[in-house]
Amino acid sequence: MQPDLFSKASKQSAATQPKEIPDASDPSARAAWLRSELNRHNYAYYVLDNPIVPDAEYDQLFRELQALEASHPELLVFDSPTQRVGALALTAFPPVTHSVPMLSLGNGFEDEDVLAFDKRVSEGLNSREEVEYATELKFDGLAINLRYEDGVLVQAATRGDGATGENVTANIRTVRAIPLRLHTNNPPKVLDVRGEVMMYKADLAKLNARQRDAGAKEFANPRNAAAGSLRQLDSRITAQRSLRFFSYGIGLLEGADMPASHSALLDWYAELGIPVCSERAVVRGVQGLLEFYKATSEKRPQLPYEIDGVVYKVNRVDQQLQLGFVSRAPRFAIAHKFPAEEALTTVQDIEVQVGRTGAITPVARLAPVLVGGVTVTNATLHNEDEVRRKDIQIGDTVIVRRAGDVIPEVVAFVPERRPASARPFIMPSSCPVCGSPIVRLEDEAIARCSGGWVKCAAQRKGGLLHFVSRRAMDVEGLGDQLVEQLVDKHIITTAADLYKLGFRALAELDRMADKSAQNVLDALEKSKRTTLARFIYALGIRHVGEATAKELARHFGNLDALLQASPEQLLEVADIGPVVAASITAFFTDAMNIELIEQLRAAGVTWPEHVVENRPRPLAGKTFVLTGTLPTLSRDAAAEKIEAAGGKVAGSVSKKTSYVVAGAEAGSKLAKAEELGVTILDETGLLQLLDSDEQD
């Protein structure tokens, strides 16, 4: 079990906390407080490998101290955090003195920072031409120096304070991506490879699942997991965890010529068998830098690992040497950081929301905070057990994360900032919407409102929104606000009531004009012509998603056969187990659900009869994953062709995946397929496979 380094850091630093935080009116006191605060965070981040604030808050404090020292030079002291790289090494591992210091990079946060960097570089080189830059990713992991002597890995050390790190050779030898011997017959006498040890997001999920099963502490993010794994005293534990490595720089080099450029250095590394990230480019001028930043930002959610920015380096080594270094960073490089995906805020309250199936979900109401470029005021806490496990209380200061389009989540609370007035969340005993009892089955993590859609307006609204959604009945114009009005004004109760709506009832609603009302009626009329699979999915049967609805339609051929199916017959359908079969049976034995189905049929909802084919389907048993943009087929069209031939379309790549169909700008799914050796097809290959199967 991991030691609780979080609380350890809190206890150690408690004495350094002033009773009152000085403000800018007293520059000397403010600078002293900033130095103390940054040193405290440095210790938690670099030494304990368990940061107690997000990077964005640390960066803000660091820049404030830099500005204060610039405007008041007399406040600059030799041991200021602005004059050093990191923190001291633990004594648990032998210290290692780096032959060439491992410096940090300066940070840029806005386009203007990049423009200023390019201007400084051009002036430093006295160049009127656009400078050539190497661009690469800024990984969110642990910086490492790998020393090779005569081609053999002899030592690995952490960055530490930049001058002295920790010897973690035994643990690094367990990272399979790192070669123990370079792939060359003519190795340099000494080569120091600089790079980052990290953990992929999927590997973190697997590790945390094992941690939960063992009753051990989970890791908040991939960086903490990588750092905690690499700094295990028992290397056998490290060997059980999937760590990765990418190289990005060089320290000492003896017995070989230095490559002429940074891009050539990485190409050389790749030839030596040292992992190099493919997400890099050589560009010219500031426009090339910003285009790389934009492209990387767009593909960031699909990457299999965490990054917090990109790095720009003057590509030519002779120009790097000409520009030189400042006290803590090279002049020839800068990190262009993304908007923070983690931030600190406070939990003002914890309320519960009711979903369409009655699921009761605790939601944290947060003091507004900017995360990933979006103001976040709410974050899901998933279920009661999750709240207890993370020990989130009302009044806590918490770390909130928002990555890409992912729903904001509360990662952890900050123990040292918990106020005396904090109070735990208590799950209500009755539904906040309809007052029905909240129940929770023994084998389920989710508590549910027992009122059902008849009693509970929240379940009615959720069920109706699901019914009209694009992949269900696909009724354009019926959004959240309109459905809410229709339910709250008691105009509709069930999905069948939608098809009884009149023009005047719609036109008189808030924010509805005559044209909008007619558009909704036209969309409802159009939706009556659907497919059996869409209709089954639209009913909102618990545990029945799109794929299962398609399998049910394909297997039974018509709705009446499905309505009469026994649990044993349902179990004959692909991918349906006892839990799903029981849920389907329960739905179709409920008299109110049968009445709803008959009302929908009476309203004119219809679909083509599906003929059950007895001949074997050629792609039966094959699982496909679609990624990227195909030249002519939309993803839906490609999926329909695959499913019509009996194949199954999944959302993620695994060892069970038969084919990955990749188009332009394919992301992490393609990389995962290559890693697992899954067969990769382009659109032409898919169509050829379908054609050959049809001929067979």
UniProtKB/Swiss-Prot annotation:
Enzyme kind, highest EC tier: ligase
Domain BRCT: 614-696
SMART domains registered for this protein in UniProt: BRCT (SM00292), HhH1 (SM00278), LIGANc (SM00532)
E.C. code: 6.5.1.2
Keyword annotations of the record: DNA damage, DNA repair, DNA replication, Ligase, Magnesium, Manganese, Metal-binding, NAD, Zinc
Cofactor: Mg(2+); Mn(2+)
Disordered: annotated span: 1-28
GO molecular function: DNA binding; DNA ligase (NAD+) activity; metal ion binding
Catalytic activity from the UniProt record: NAD(+) + (deoxyribonucleotide)n-3'-hydroxyl + 5'-phospho-(deoxyribonucleotide)m = (deoxyribonucleotide)n+m + AMP + beta-nicotinamide D-nucleotide
Binding of NAD(+), residues: 55-59, 104-105, 136, 159, 196, 313, 337
GO BP annotations, alphabetical order: DNA repair; DNA replication
Function: DNA ligase that catalyzes the formation of phosphodiester linkages between 5'-phosphoryl and 3'-hydroxyl groups in double-stranded DNA using NAD as a coenzyme and as the energy source for the reaction. It is essential for DNA replication and repair of damaged DNA.
Family that this chain belongs to: Belongs to the NAD-dependent DNA ligase family. LigA subfamily.
NCBIfam families: dnlj, PRK07956.1
Cited PANTHER family: CHROMOSOME TRANSMISSION FIDELITY FACTOR 18 (PTHR23389), DNA LIGASE (PTHR23389:SF9)
Protein name (database record): DNA ligase
